[in-house]
Structure formats: C-alpha cells, structure tokens
C-alpha cells in the first residue's frame, strides 16, 4: 500500500492502459527496448523506497505463505474367502487432517520492522478505522520470522465404512464395492480481525457436516488369452475443499450458504489385446459431475468493491476415448504410443451469490452464471505421445519422448458469465 506495484506486468504499467498517446508511445518504446528497470523486478528501487519511508517501517517486504499439514489415519480391513471364486473385503477407516495457514515475514528489505495492519482500508470512508489484523495484539510490530496478516487452522474429520464383493471364474471377473461415511470441516482463527470482531474471525467456526459415499461395479470377460473386455460404472460424492466452504478463510469464520457434496457419475469401457510383441488398450469414458462449489475473491467493477463470490451447482460433462500401445521392436527396443480425444464442457449454469468482502453484505443473490456448454479450461482435449526406449546391458538405458496437446481452452470466468440482477 502507498507504493507502486512491484509487478512489472501490472496492468497500469502496460502501454495499453495509457490514455495519453505520448505516454503510450514512451511505454511501448521502453518495453521494445527491454529496459530491465521496467520489464524486470527492480530490487534496488525497493530498498531505496524502504530507506525513504516516512515512519521507518518497511514499504516493500518479502513474505512466506506457510501451509503446515498434519494427517492421521486409522484403517482396519478384513478379508473373507467364501469360496474359491468369491471373496469379500470389508473395513472401516478414520482420518483427521489439521492444516495451519499463516503469513511469515521473510525479509524487510533494509528496514527493521513492519506494523501489522490492513493497509488497504486506510482510505476507506467506512472501514478506515478498522485496520487491525489482530485486535488481541493491536499495531503489532513485526520483525523477520514473525507471523502476521492471518493465522488459522482448518480441520477435517472423516469416518467411513465399506466393503466389496469379488467373483472370479475362468473367463469372468465381477466386482462391486460400496463405502459410506461422514465428514466435518471447521475453521479455527488465531487472529481476531477488526472487520469481523469476536467469534466472526477468532476461535472455532460452525462445523460443516457432509455424507460422502462411493459405489462402484465392474465386470470383465476374457474372450481368449489375447482379448479382454471390461465395463466399470460408479457413483460418488466428495466433501468440498476448505477454500470453497468459507467466504474468506484467511480472516472470516462465515461459511457459504447450504454447502453440499459434489456428485460424480461415470462409466468406462476397456478393451485389451495382448500379442506376442504388442499390447494394445482402448478406453471409452464418460464422467458427469454436479453440485460443485467454488469461492472466488475479486474486485467487482459493477459494485466497485472487493467481493467474495460463492458459486453452487457447478456441473461438467466429460467424454472421450483413449488408446495406448506398447510395441516391442527388438530385444532391447520398446516403442510406446498413446493418444486421447475428448470433449470436456460445463453442463450446468451455476447459481452465484456475491458478498462485499469488508462486511459480508449480499450484493447479488442467486444470480445465474451462464457457463453451460463452455469448454472446461486448462485441460487439453486432444493429446498424443510417443516414447522410444533402449535397454542396454548392465542396467543402463536411453529414452526419447515426444508429446503433443491440442484443444486447450482458457478457463471461463464465473464473473464474466454472470448476469447481475438489480
């Protein structure tokens, strides 16, 4: 705050942001000339700015965003062979995950301290007098190695019980499995944020409860030694990630409204052919998800305020085909080929509620984000792979690989697809 952005690609430093033609041309020339004072991080300037700070505290600093995760799991399993062909497996499990998140000062860049406040609120006409990140330690002096900004725990408790039944004959294999469980998630804040004083930020939040499950069935048949066909279907639900369950995990105990499990339904058909020097496998698949949840933080230009957006009812449809082949070219030479083609798209229009980040005021409730039929981003929908391996004597080898991806789309924005209702 109260200093130029350290990011060279900050949008205000880009030529396209400049409205004055002369300034725009100057910025274009700077970037074309690759002037490192503008195109790279200027560390010397950060130290100079810190030396000239009015109150002696750091203006620029380096921080670590620390995540400390501890997992504990207990598992008990049993197996009963009812007959030569029929096997029953069963078990129970319990798990607990404790995750601690906080910011830690790494480097004050020439200064000796930093005051722990929310500096982005200083010029706010409404909340400019609520700057404390921790009311229990107001205006805390932060030195290198100290925690500041936010500090909270996220705990997930899970328990489940399940079983499976497997039947094997000469050519036929059938398998069915089921698991049901219960899960709870809660946040525990170690700082009392002035914006959300009391138990709105400090201490334990309300626990959120879920009932995840998994049902899976498969059947496979070997027509001969070389030909095998297998079909699998499944249905499951999972507990959402903690980031998608609270409006702002860093300093707010408030959960989203009506949290629910994400549902997933799918089917696969696999064919395998095994020859003397070739092994080939082809797969057809379809996966449908529903009731997904996401929380995003952004500056809403429509409402001119920093906002927390909670989206519910996110659903996707993915289907396609995959094929792999392992070819033995010679005694020491192997060739691996793989390809996939699919269509991955959003199938539902999520329902979105927008909150003001500073006070959780509802800015827009149950608006529709028209993402249905948009392509899922960040995942290639066409892929190809080839790998050549040579295995030499005495354990050494040489490997060469090539890969290609296509039809990769930018992830659609829940915000840009949003229709505001006023």
Model-inferred region functions:
Residues 168-171, 285-288, 309-414:
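Gram-negative outer-membrane beta-barrel transporters
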Residues 85-88, 171-174, 226-229, 277-280, ...:
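Repeated loop/turn-to-beta-strand initiation elements of outer-membrane beta-barrel proteins
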Residues 132, 136-141, 184-196, 207, ...:
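Surface-exposed extracellular loop regions of Gram-negative outer-membrane beta-barrel proteins
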Residues 419-421:
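Conserved small/polar residues in nucleotide/adenosyl-binding loops
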Residues 1, 90-96, 176-182, 231-235, ...:
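Transmembrane beta-barrel strands of outer-membrane/channel proteins
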Residues 61, 65, 87-224, 351, ...:
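Signature of Gram-negative outer-membrane beta-barrel scaffolds
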Residues 3-17, 43-52, 103-147, 195-200, ...:
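Surface-exposed loop/turn segments flanking beta-strands in extracellular/periplasmic regions
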Residues 1-99, 103, 279-283:
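Outer-membrane beta-barrel domain signature, strongest for Gram-negative TonB-dependent receptors
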């Amino acid at each position: 705050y109260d200093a130029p952005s350290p990011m060279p690609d900050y949008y205000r430093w880009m030529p396209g942001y400049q409205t004055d033609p002369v300034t725009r041309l100057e910025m274009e020339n700077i970037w074309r000339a690759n002037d490192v004072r503008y195109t790279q991080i200027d560390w010397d300037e950060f130290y100079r700015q810190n030396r000239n700070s009015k109150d002696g505290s750091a203006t620029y600093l380096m921080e670590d965003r620390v995540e400390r995760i501890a997992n504990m799991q207990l598992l008990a399993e049993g197996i009963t062979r009812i007959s030569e062909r029929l096997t029953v497996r069963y078990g129970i499990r319990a798990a607990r995950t404790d995750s601690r998140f906080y910011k830690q000062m790494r480097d004050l860049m020439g200064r000796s301290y930093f005051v722990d406040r929310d500096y982005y609120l200083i010029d706010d006409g409404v909340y400019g007098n609520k700057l404390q990140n921790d009311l229990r330690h107001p205006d805390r002096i932060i030195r290198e190695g100290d925690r500041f900004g936010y500090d909270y725990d996220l705990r997930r408790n899970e328990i489940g019980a399940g079983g499976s039944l497997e039947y094997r004959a000469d050519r036929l294999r059938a398998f069915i499995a089921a698991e049901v469980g219960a899960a709870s998630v809660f946040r525990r804040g170690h700082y009392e944020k002035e914006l959300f004083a009391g138990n709105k930020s400090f201490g334990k939040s309300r626990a959120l409860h879920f009932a995840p499950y998994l049902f899976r069935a498969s059947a496979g048949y070997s027509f001969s030694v070389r030909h095998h066909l297998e079909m699998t279907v499944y249905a499951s639900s999972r507990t959402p990630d903690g980031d998608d369950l609270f409006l702002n995990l860093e300093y707010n105990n408030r959960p989203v409204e009506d949290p629910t499990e994400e549902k997933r339904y799918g089917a696969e058909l696999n064919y395998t052919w095994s020859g003397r020097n070739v092994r080939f496998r082809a797969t057809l698949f379809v996966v449908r998800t529903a009731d997904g949840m996401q929380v995003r933080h952004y500056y809403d230009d429509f409402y001119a305020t920093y906002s927390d957006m909670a989206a519910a009812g996110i659903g996707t449809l993915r289907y396609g085909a995959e094929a792999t082949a392992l070819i033995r070219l010679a005694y020491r030479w192997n060739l691996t080929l793989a390809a996939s083609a699919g269509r991955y798209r959003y199938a539902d229009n999520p329902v979105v509620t927008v909150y003001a980040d500073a006070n959780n005021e509802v800015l827009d409730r149950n608006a529709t984000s028209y993402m249905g039929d948009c392509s899922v981003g960040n995942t290639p929908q066409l892929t190809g792979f080839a790998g050549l391996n040579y295995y030499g004597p005495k354990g050494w080898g040489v490997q060469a690989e090539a890969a290609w991806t296509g039809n990769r789309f930018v992830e659609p924005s829940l915000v840009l697809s949003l229709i505001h209702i006023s």
